[in-house]
Design a protein with these regions (language model features):
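Transmembrane beta-barrel strands of outer-membrane/channel proteins
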Residues: 44-53, 84-90, 126-134, 170-174, ...
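Outer-membrane beta-barrel translocator/channel fold
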Residues: 90-99, 204-256, 260-282
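Repeated loop/turn-to-beta-strand initiation elements of outer-membrane beta-barrel proteins
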Residues: 80-86, 119-124, 164-168, 196-199, ...
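Outer-membrane beta-barrel "beta-signal"
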Residues: 186-191, 196, 253-255, 286-303
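Hydrophobic, lipid-facing positions within transmembrane beta-strands of outer-membrane proteins
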Residues: 66-74, 105-111, 132, 150-156, ...
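Residue-level signature of outer-membrane beta-barrel architecture
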Residues: 74-78, 111-117, 156-160, 191, ...
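Short glycine/proline- and aromatic-enriched beta-strand/turn motifs that initiate or cap beta-hairpins
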Residues: 29-96, 218-221
Length: 303
């Protein structure tokens, strides 16, 4: 009896660690935007993350920029069907030789709600997250809120387990990960060639996960990495939309240091980066920037 309980608990731990490896990008999310398409982690948790981007140059020698990203996520799993949360994304943008209609402090506050259903080998998830995305001089004053500062992020994703090692997911998502709001199809094929490996090929994200040990997981992922903010100048008499779009190739290593604590370190490369922004003189520009490297660290505590 005692051995059976031990085996059951061991299997449960392995299952949880497997889930964590699949959901690592959720925990260490240093994206300027919100990824509502990603399956939420199957545990209540509080996580914080910091990412530092190296300085990069705009095309045509228009200027230089660097960015710091911060994220905070609080998630509560009510039961097998409902997951609620609240989150915050913050980007500190420093731009040289260009005067923008923003102070460079960009925030996105969001409240995600996930409904999950599963029967036999099929699953369905509906996720929705109202969000406020704007510069700090807007978010701190409710009188400055407008419809342009609000976002509604949604995802409807179906899943089917074709075999023990092969799964299929498909659906639609609507968010700002490509910059301006887009509704786009989601499709993915999940293949587990070995108990320690998982290959997920799809759109808009693909990833390779490897369980190094029972407490150490490695993930390589490529995904869109953009967002949009409603911004105002210092005197609040000018406003515009600030749009950023890019792709991110990132490797992350996660260490489950304790049953309730997980540490993650990562290094990534952003490319195909484009900014659409309004200058202080009302000129609207769209410029690309050179690829940039970023490093990050995150800490998650599981309730």
């Amino acid at each position: 009896m005692r051995d059976a309980i031990i085996r059951k608990n061991a299997n449960l731990v392995r299952t949880c660690l497997s889930c964590l490896s699949l959901c690592l990008p959720c925990i260490s999310n240093g994206s300027p935007g919100v990824d509502i398409c990603q399956e939420p982690i199957a545990e209540s948790n509080l996580s914080i993350a910091y990412y530092d981007n190296e300085k990069t140059s705009f095309e045509r020698n228009l200027g230089e920029t660097n960015r710091d990203n911060f994220s905070t996520d609080l998630q509560f799993k009510m039961n097998d069907n409902w997951i609620f949360g609240v989150g915050h994304r913050s980007a500190i943008l420093d731009v040289e030789r260009l005067e923008l209609q923003t102070n460079g402090y960009l925030h996105t506050f969001f409240v995600p709600v996930h409904r999950l259903d599963q029967s036999d080998n099929k699953s369905f998830r509906f996720s929705i997250a109202p969000a406020l995305s704007a510069s700090s001089n807007v978010t701190k004053d409710p009188n400055e809120y407008t419809a342009d500062a609000l976002q509604l992020l949604v995802a409807l994703v179906w899943g089917e387990q074709i075999s023990d090692r092969l799964g299929l997911s498909y659906g639609i998502c609507g968010d700002h990960r490509f910059g301006e709001y887009q509704v786009y199809p989601v499709i993915g094929i999940n293949w587990q060639p070995h108990a320690d490996w998982l290959i997920e090929l799809g759109f808009p994200a693909s990833r390779l996960s490897y369980e190094v040990t029972k407490s150490l997981t490695s993930v390589l992922q490529i995904a869109p990495n953009g967002n949009e903010w409603y911004v105002k100048n210092k005197s609040l008499d000018k406003h515009s939309q600030f749009v950023y779009e890019a792709y991110l190739l990132e490797w992350a290593l996660s260490w489950r240091a304790h049953q309730k604590i997980m540490l993650t370190a990562s290094v990534g490369r952003e490319f195909h980066s484009r900014y659409e922004m309004t200058l202080l003189n009302e000129t609207r520009i769209r410029v690309s920037s050179d690829p940039t490297t970023r490093v990050g660290v995150s800490l998650a505590w599981f309730c």
